[in-house]
Every structure is written in structure tokens, then in C-alpha cells.
A protein has these predicted regions:
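Divalent-metal (often Zn2+) His-rich catalytic cores of metallo-beta-lactamase-fold enzymes
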Residues: 487, 511-547
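Flexible, processing/modification-adjacent segments and terminal tails
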Residues: 31-38, 42, 120-221, 239-247, ...
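Conserved beta-strand hairpin/beta-sheet module of binuclear metal-dependent hydrolase folds
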Residues: 327-371, 477-496
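Active-site metal-binding motif and surrounding structural segment of the metallo-beta-lactamase
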Residues: 362-407, 517-521
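N-terminal mature ectodomain segment of secretory-pathway/periplasmic proteins
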Residues: 35-42, 46-152, 187-191, 195-202
Length: 547
């Protein structure tokens, strides 16, 4: 009986203990990642702590920078970078990550670049030249605008350019770490061993582990490499470009460039930006353009951001309709204007040709529809490309889609055929060639290259095409001449959207000399930028002292 009672008491004690003390829960299993992938959270947390991101809400930085003009190279080649237009003196940038706004301002010599262009991508001729030394560029959400001069009129930039500007808020160490905390960022991480850069970092001895964290920022996937000191070094994404498609866009920083800005905040003071691949050993591109922006920007003011960057109504309400305004130049010859760049349609007996396919696919589609109305039931058989600057060539792929043959200078062919007119997928802004590639692109009749001259004819009408050289602005320039109509078609040599010069530049002198040597007799010059003018209005300037 005693044993029975003692057993009962033991059972009661065990039940009471069970009810009084909850059973210890097992620790959840660590999150599993596929082979090659690692947890991004500890990497991001350590990086934020290392450079004091949580203490930084905004920053104003100042210094001197350079501007590389994407797509404005004289000639596309393995060792030819984007041209640097001028230094950006008194460069100042304010980035506010509480409001996701940005303001940039600097001084640059007037008359060298379009007023709407700051650096890198976005150069569009015909939009108006910079006339005041001081330039201001602002970004708030989807709105981007500029002011030429401190009291200049706020002017919106086209949406396809404004949508790229926000990546600058993220392609820096603090901006990336803040963007990684936004809804939808969905961070992912991987690792790799890295050696130093060939020819820069000395003998390659021992690779080091580098972590790569990738986030989404709107439609852009942005990557950051994080070294063993938890410092962000390379921030990289792709942006859409009418010529190069998904174009590499990155900023690079070194550990040595970070300074202590106070309150635990570290911020880089040397900027180095690439737009386009800088690694010609591996990218296999023909174009080597890459350096777009950079320089010593050593004055760092954390949490100083006085300008609210409010969007002006004139910017908020700005529209950018794609319109084509047609002017008949002669029977079967039409100027297709209404934009920064013109095209010219020429009718032949059983086909038509278009002189210049500028800007982008939207522009080309509008022009093509207008040509079909003006010259019905005749295919657009040829499109003549004046030069390989991106704003003049950006619409060519659309003509490939409809089956036209491109006529360009032979020096452009390798660049176009490899980097530009290809089947490479365009994921950020697909165009018609990337969506519906013609099955015989590699074998089809898509190219005619010109060395000195070329003639399109139907036996009645001739369109003579000539190589214009030498030029400082660009290599491989073509012009066209209709002898019966005495119309001279050209790009970038006589721009009537701006007042004519009082003296001729060297390129204009050589253009005039080419017309004289070829014994052409134009009555009017028809520019890609601006309205046609009588040829004597241009030629008479030669009597003045030239530059």
C-alpha cells in the first residue's frame, strides 16, 4: 500500500511540474540557401554598422568631376572612350534618402553640350545648347528637370532619361544599404573569390572572398560587392539604351576613399563611374566607351540637405508627345520634323528611302507610319545613317524590324553589327527586333557600307551619298544630295535650330570644301537639326575669318 501511495504522489508531482513549466521550444532550423548563395541579412547589417548608414539621412558632397558623353565618341573602337567634354567645376550633389530626392549643380563652359545633359547617358543634340555656365539638375520621384543658370526656367527632361537618374541615389554605399530595406528589395547574396585588377593592383597572389548582394529597386536589379572589412566597393546595375540595349552602369569605390564624416558615418570621397563595360578582355564589345563620371569629391556634409527639391508645376505637367510634322521639299521628297531630329523621305519608282533614323524606336515607328501614308504601297527599302552617335543611330533597329537595308559608312559596320544590330535580349526595354528577331538577320540583306560614295537610283531619280571628311566631331559621316532637286541633306554640320555662326568651324570648312570638290550645286541645305535654309546663307559665312 505504501508503494502504491508513493507512486501516486510521484505521478502527481510530475504532472504539476509539467503544467507549471512550459516545455522548452526547439530553436528553429537555420534558413537554408541553395549552393552558391548565402544569407544577405548579416552582410547588410554589418555593412550598415561599418559605415554608419543608420545615422545618415542625407548628405551634401562637393568637389570637382569630369563628364563623359555616352554615345558621342568620334569613332567606336577597342581603345576609344566616351569623350570628356569639360570639367565640372564646383560640383555639388545633395542626396536625401528620407525623401528620395537629389540635386546636382556645377559650372561648365557654355556652348559645349546640350543644356539638358549633365554627364553620361542622355546627350541629345537639337535640344538647345548650354548657354549659362551654371547648371542645376534635380530629381524627385519620376520627375527629372534642369535649370540652365541659377534663375533659369525649370525644364523637364524626357521620361526615358528621367527614369535612369534615380539609380544614382542607390549606386553609392549608403544609398544601396537604404534601398535594401525598402519593400520589394528582396535581397539575395552570393560569394566568389576575387583577384586584383590586371595591370593596376600588382602581382596576383592570393584571392579574397567577396560577397555580392543583389536587390531590386523598381525595375532595376542592383548589385553591391562587399569586402572582408564590410565596405561596399562596386555598385552595379543595367539601364536601357536605344543603341547598346541593357547597358552596364556602375560606380566603384576603394576603402582608402572613405573618410570619417563624424557620428560613426564613413563616406567615399573619390567617385568613379562606368556606363558601358570597362573590361574589354571579357566583354568582347567593339565599343570601349565606359568612363562617364568621376573625380575627387572630398567635401562631405552629413545630414545637410537644405533644398526640398519640390517639383515645379511646369515639370509635373510636361508632356513629350511623339509627333511628325511633314514639309514637302519637292515632288516625292518630304521633311519629317516635329522633334529634335529630322528625317527625310525620298520616293523612288518602286520603293522609298529614309535619310536618318534618330533617337529611338518610338520616333522611328511614328516616322515609318507617316512615310507609309505619304508614299503608299512602296516598301521602305533603304535607311541612310549619317553617323554613329547614339542620338543619330538610335532608331535604326526599327528599320531592321520592317526589313529595310541600312546604308552607313564602312567604319561603323563592325560596331553596329556586333554591339547594336543583334539578337541580344533587351530585358529592361524590349524593342521589336529583340521581341521578334527576323530569322535571317545574320544572312539577310541588311547592310550596304559606303567608303567614298554610293548612289540610290531608279533610273530617273538619283540620291548621291558621300563620305564627309576629315571631321573632328565624328568619323564615318555621310551626307546625301539630290542633284535634280538641288537638295543637300546633312547632320551636325549646319544646325539651324541654333543661330548660324559668324565664322565657320574647322568641320564646317571641310564640309564646304567637300561640297566644292564634289562639284555639287545645292540650292538648299536640309539639316537633321532645324529647318532647311538656302545654301548661300551658309556658304557666305566662309568669307568671314574662320575658327
Amino acid at each position: 500500500m505504501a508503494r502504491t501511495l508513493s507512486g501516486i504522489w510521484l505521478l502527481l508531482i510530475l504532472v504539476a511540474l509539467t503544467q507549471a513549466a512550459p516545455v522548452a521550444r526547439q530553436a528553429p532550423a537555420a534558413q537554408q540557401f541553395p549552393p552558391g548563395y548565402i544569407d544577405p541579412r548579416p552582410i547588410l547589417d554589418a555593412a550598415r554598422k561599418a559605415i554608419g548608414t543608420d545615422a545618415l539621412h542625407c548628405v551634401t558632397i562637393s568637389g570637382t568631376a569630369y563628364d563623359g558623353a555616352v554615345g558621342q565618341q568620334k569613332e567606336a573602337g577597342k581603345n576609344i572612350d566616351w569623350p570628356r567634354i569639360d570639367s565640372l567645376a564646383n560640383y555639388t550633389r545633395t542626396m536625401n534618402w528620407d525623401n528620395w530626392t537629389m540635386k546636382e549643380e556645377f559650372d561648365r563652359k557654355p556652348g559645349l553640350a546640350p543644356a539638358m545633359w549633365k554627364y553620361g547617358i542622355g546627350w541629345i543634340d537639337g535640344t538647345g545648347m548650354q548657354k549659362n555656365a551654371h547648371e542645376i539638375f534635380m530629381l524627385n520621384g519620376k520627375y527629372g528637370w534642369y535649370m540652365n543658370g541659377a534663375n533659369g526656367k525649370p525644364t523637364a527632361v524626357p521620361p526615358d532619361i528621367a527614369e535612369i537618374w534615380p539609380v544614382e541615389l542607390v549606386l553609392n554605399p549608403h544609398g544601396f544599404l537604404k534601398a535594401a530595406q525598402l519593400p520589394g528589395a528582396n535581397p539575395k547574396a552570393a560569394w566568389r573569390w576575387e583577384l586584383g585588377e590586371l595591370g593596376r593592383d600588382g602581382p596576383e597572389v592570393q584571392p579574397e572572398i567577396t560577397r555580392i548582394v543583389s536587390i531590386m529597386y523598381g525595375k532595376y536589379r542592383i548589385d553591391a560587392t562587399v569586402n572582408k572589412e564590410n565596405m561596399l566597393q562596386r555598385l552595379h546595375t543595367w539601364v536601357p539604351d536605344p543603341v547598346l540595349g541593357d547597358m552596364n552602369y556602375e560606380h566603384e569605390f576603394t576603402n582608402q576613399s572613405y573618410i570619417d564624416a563624424g557620428n560613426g558615418i564613413k563616406f567615399p570621397t573619390v567617385w568613379h563611374s562606368h556606363q558601358g563595360w570597362d573590361d574589354n578582355f571579357n566583354s568582347q564589345n567593339i565599343s570601349a566607351g565606359h568612363n562617364a563620371f568621376g573625380g575627387p569629391i572630398k567635401d562631405v556634409k552629413p545630414n545637410v540637405c537644405p533644398d526640398p527639391v519640390a517639383v515645379p508645376d511646369v515639370v509635373r505637367n510636361a508632356t513629350f508627345p511623339v509627333r511628325v510634322e511633314t514639309t514637302k521639299l519637292a515632288d516625292g521628297v518630304y521633311l519629317l520634323g516635329g522633334a529634335t531630329h529630322n528625317s527625310v523621305a525620298i520616293e523612288f519608282s518602286n520603293y522609298s528611302a529614309v535619310f536618318e533614323a534618330p533617337l529611338n524606336e518610338e520616333r522611328s515607328l511614328a516616322v515609318i507610319e507617316e512615310v507609309r501614308k505619304l508614299i503608299p504601297n512602296k516598301p521602305i527599302r533603304f535607311v541612310i545613317n549619317t553617323n554613329q552617335h547614339s542620338d543619330h543611330a538610335g532608331g535604326l533597329r526599327t528599320y531592321v524590324h520592317i526589313g529595310a537595308t541600312i546604308i552607313t559608312h564602312f567604319k561603323n559596320f563592325e560596331y553596329y553589327n556586333h554591339d547594336f544590330i543583334n539578337y541580344t535580349p533587351r530585358t529592361l526595354k524590349p524593342d521589336m527586333v529583340s521581341l521578334w528577331p527576323p530569322t535571317e538577320l545574320a544572312e539577310g540583306y541588311y547592310w550596304e557600307t559606303v567608303r567614298e560614295n554610293y548612289v540610290l537610283t531608279d533610273g530617273t531619280r538619283n540620291l548621291n551619298i558621300y563620305y564627309v571628311n576629315p571631321l573632328q566631331k565624328v568619323e564615318g559621316m555621310l551626307m546625301a544630295y539630290l542633284p535634280k532637286e538641288k537638295l543637300l541633306l546633312e547632320a551636325d554640320l549646319v544646325d539651324t535650330n541654333e543661330p548660324l555662326p559668324t565664322t565657320l568651324s574647322r568641320d564646317q570648312q571641310n564640309f564646304l570644301k567637300a561640297v566644292q570638290l564634289l562639284k555639287l550645286d545645292p540650292a538648299r541645305v536640309v539639316p537633321v537639326h532645324g529647318k532647311p535654309i538656302p545654301w548661300p546663307d551658309f556658304a557666305k559665312i566662309a568669307a568671314n575669318k574662320s575658327n
